[in-house]
């Protein structure tokens, strides 16, 4: 059984693949309610990781809110316009955990990021927090 093997060109690879959001049901807000969750590009993921660190390279206090920050980054309307801003992070943290985790899990899934990647960011921030 042989499968076709096609090596793509540099030009093909450098053309961004059109992002496709994943609609996450949020029935807590009413029947049929969804939040579109968009994938992060490689550049956006790198920026997200960098935001979790201070200028000294150590995780900053904001890294504790890694899930909330991921929700801000990935939840957008049907046109890709962000639903939330960084000013909403504290309020997102007050939201029902099940809803937030659903959005976080969808963001990880569509972006190809593992939950271990996010846990590592959060763990690194814990190491710098006073006991």
Could you tell me what each predicted segment is?
Residues 1-20:
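Extended acidic low-complexity intrinsically disordered regions
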Residues 20-30:
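Short acidic-hydrophobic surface loop/beta-edge motif
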């Amino acid at each position: 059984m042989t499968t076709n093997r096609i090596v793509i060109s540099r030009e093909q690879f450098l053309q961004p693949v059109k992002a496709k959001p994943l609609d996450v049901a949020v029935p807590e807000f009413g029947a049929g309610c969804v939040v579109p969750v968009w994938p992060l590009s490689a550049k956006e993921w790198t920026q997200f990781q960098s935001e979790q660190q201070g200028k000294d390279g150590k995780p900053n206090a904001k890294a504790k809110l890694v899930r909330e920050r991921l929700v801000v980054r990935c939840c957008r309307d049907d046109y890709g316009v962000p639903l939330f801003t960084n000013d909403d992070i504290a309020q997102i943290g007050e939201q029902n955990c099940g809803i937030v985790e659903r959005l976080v899990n969808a963001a990880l899934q569509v972006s190809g990021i593992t939950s271990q990647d996010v846990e590592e960011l959060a763990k690194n921030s814990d190491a710098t927090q006073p006991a």
